[in-house]
């Protein structure tokens, strides 16, 4: 075993979406960084759908951008269709989504990593961890190299003891075509990490030229929609394409029903729990038997390939059933399968041994991010990578940890949820998880979080000044429009009051009063409209947060002895000792902790402070 001469500040294991974000931000903060991948040709590979964003997820990507991360930038560079979802619904649930070219996404991400000062990229498969007295020292690889590091970030995705299922056939793999990582799971188990299994899946890929698009519904993109916060209109650099919608038929249901016993999921061959909000087609047919059909979305995988992703047909059926099933779908009667669908099981680590910083409680200096923490989705993984990278560097520099709160970000919601809950299914972000989602809109992420990006050294002075200028414009315009009165309809009202009417938009008001309503571009116009139209609701949510902040942010001492607090229920003592929450707010969200327990705990914390 040869030891590499550099002792890195940060070693990142895995170059998926979590690992890339962790490595990039660590290097940008001035650390010496090594990122290890078992295959450099699959850096930032989109293993499942060729898309970024969506409801809740698009909010996270905007937050990553506001903090100085790179997912938004790479998405904009490789996007081949951009949309805003839920445009007819309230502002809290509107979200950007992009169809991306899978190859271009990989190319742009790899290029960014390769050009980052202080960041070294190396091909290698990590087999074990090096630690001394529960402090991380580095990693060893299958290739016989030891790398030393002050901190290590594990972002192993679905590779830890990955097991691929296609009907009654199963074989080890991190994804189809890539080997599984077995050494890491063993290394973590030996060190006392609680590990369980989860499952996810992916649909078949088809040849576009074999599809009859004439019977499908075309779904074009929306103009001017990107992920990076910018002051100028967004013009995508790549040609834009459409997606297409079709649906299953009665024949599809019959094929699945006749072969349900051959599904790896229903045949009892899969022990891991799959994602509730992305079920397989056989799961949908069984659980929603009354539905006559299910929508299928045909999504291009790139502009230089004929392959398309069949969103909605994820399955663990054997290939012969997949073949018949595909050809029962409207427009896919002659479809040619290029890659089979499959399910994959993998190991993940329980959240009770992870701090909200994403540092392990069992080994100092070891951080975990992405699907190893039980999440599903590129966006959730990238956000965790960003947080793990920031906190790894802060640990090396002996600076305070960075933990965004759930009151100010979806990333904060996720961190809090992951470290206060035992997951029974893969964790996916959606807007309903946030208590104050009207404050956490996708359009105002830069206004909420950019000051953190600046302070961390991740956001350039120029970009921060753009965000500050936008914030100033919004505040000044809110005040000016509240003092500008015009006759509108049958009464004289302030323009701010007029904008609060449901049927009035910023654009319609600008058409009526062009001399008074200024045009700041579609993005800033929309933010200004929402800040004014929903001001009453926003103010109430801010007041509620303020009233709860004192107890929410009360810090629980690390050396508190829960077993000695006799007034706590037995379940509360067990759960608090297991999760060791850092604040009263986090403690209150642990399942099984009652309001009475929280009141007792607050008294105990205050007493502890006076001792």
Swiss-Prot record:
Transmembrane segments: none annotated. It is found in: Cytoplasm. Keywords: Cytoplasm, FAD, Flavoprotein, NAD, tRNA processing. The keyword Ubl conjugation does not apply. NAD(+) binds at residues 274-288. Its main location: cytoplasm. GO terms for biological process: tRNA methylation; tRNA wobble uridine modification. SUPFAM superfamilies: FAD/NAD(P)-binding domain. SMART domains: GIDA_assoc_3. Pfam families: GIDA, GIDA_C_1st, SAM_GIDA_C. PANTHER family: GLUCOSE INHIBITED DIVISION PROTEIN A, PROTEIN MTO1 HOMOLOG, MITOCHONDRIAL. HAMAP family: MnmG_GidA (MF_00129). This is tRNA uridine 5-carboxymethylaminomethyl modification enzyme MnmG. The gene is mnmG.
């Amino acid at each position: 075993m040869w030891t590499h001469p550099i002792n890195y500040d940060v070693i990142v294991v895995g170059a998926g979406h979590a690992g890339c974000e962790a490595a990039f931000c660590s290097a940008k903060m001035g650390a010496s960084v090594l990122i290890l991948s078992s295959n450099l040709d699959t850096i930032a590979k989109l293993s499942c759908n060729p898309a970024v964003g969506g409801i809740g997820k698009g909010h996270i990507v905007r937050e990553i951008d506001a903090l100085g991360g790179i997912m938004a930038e790479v998405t904009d560079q490789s996007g081949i269709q951009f949309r805003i979802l839920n445009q007819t619904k309230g502002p809290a649930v509107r979200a950007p989504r992009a169809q991306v070219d899978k190859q271009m996404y990989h190319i742009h991400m790899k290029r960014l990593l390769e050009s980052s000062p202080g960041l070294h990229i190396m091909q290698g498969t990590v087999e074990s961890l090096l630690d001394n007295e529960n402090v991380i020292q580095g990693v060893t690889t299958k290739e016989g190299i030891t790398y030393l590091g002050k901190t290590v970030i594990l972002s192993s995705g679905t590779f830890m003891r990955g097991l691929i299922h296609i009907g009654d056939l199963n074989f080890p793999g991190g994804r189809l075509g890539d080997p599984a990582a077995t050494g890491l799971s063993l290394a973590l188990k030996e060190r006392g990490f609680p590990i369980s299994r989860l499952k996810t899946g992916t649909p078949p890929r088809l040849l576009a030229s074999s599809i009859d698009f004439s019977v499908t519904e075309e779904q074009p993109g929306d103009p001017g929609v990107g992920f990076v916060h910018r002051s100028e209109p967004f013009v995508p650099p790549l040609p834009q394409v459409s997606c297409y919608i079709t649906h299953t038929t009665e024949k599809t249901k019959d094929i699945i029903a006749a072969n349900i016993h051959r599904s790896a999921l229903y045949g009892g061959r899969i022990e891991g729990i799959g994602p509730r909000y992305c079920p397989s087609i056989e799961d949908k047919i069984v659980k929603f038997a009354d539905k006559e059909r299910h929508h299928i979305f045909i999504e291009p995988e790139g502009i230089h390939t004929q392959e398309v992703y069949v969103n909605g047909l994820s399955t663990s059926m054997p290939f012969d059933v997949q073949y018949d099933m595909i050809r029962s779908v409207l427009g896919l009667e002659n479809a040619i399968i290029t890659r089979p669908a499959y399910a994959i099981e993998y190991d993940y680590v329980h959240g009770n041994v992870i701090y909200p910083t994403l540092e392990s409680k069992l080994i100092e200096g070891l951080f975990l991010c992405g699907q190893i923490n039980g999440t599903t989705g590129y966006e959730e993984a990238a956000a965790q990578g960003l947080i793990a990278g920031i906190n790894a560097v802060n640990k090396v520099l002996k600076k305070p940890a960075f933990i965004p709160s759930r009151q100010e970000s979806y990333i904060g919601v996720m961190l809090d949820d992951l470290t206060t809950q035992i997951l029974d299914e893969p964790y996916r972000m959606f807007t309903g998880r946030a208590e104050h989602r009207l404050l956490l809109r996708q359009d105002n992420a830069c206004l909420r979080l950019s000051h953190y990006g600046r302070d961390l050294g991740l956001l350039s002075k120029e970009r921060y000044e753009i965000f500050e200028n936008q914030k100033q414009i919004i505040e000044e315009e809110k005040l000016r429009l509240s003092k500008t009165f015009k006759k509108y309809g049958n009464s004289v009202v302030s323009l701010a009051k007029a904008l609060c009417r449901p049927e009035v938009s910023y654009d319609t008001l600008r058409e009526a009063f062009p001399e008074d309503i200024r045009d700041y571009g579609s993005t800033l116009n929309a933010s200004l409209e929402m800040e004014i139209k929903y001001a009453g609701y926003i103010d109430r949510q801010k007041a509620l947060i303020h009233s709860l902040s004192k107890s929410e942010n009360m810090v629980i001492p690390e050396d508190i002895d829960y077993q000695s607090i006799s007034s706590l229920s037995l379940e509360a003592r067990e759960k608090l000792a297991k999760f060791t929450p850092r604040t009263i707010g986090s403690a209150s969200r642990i399942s099984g902790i009652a309001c009475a327990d929280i009141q007792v705990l607050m008294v105990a914390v205050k007493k502890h402070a006076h001792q």
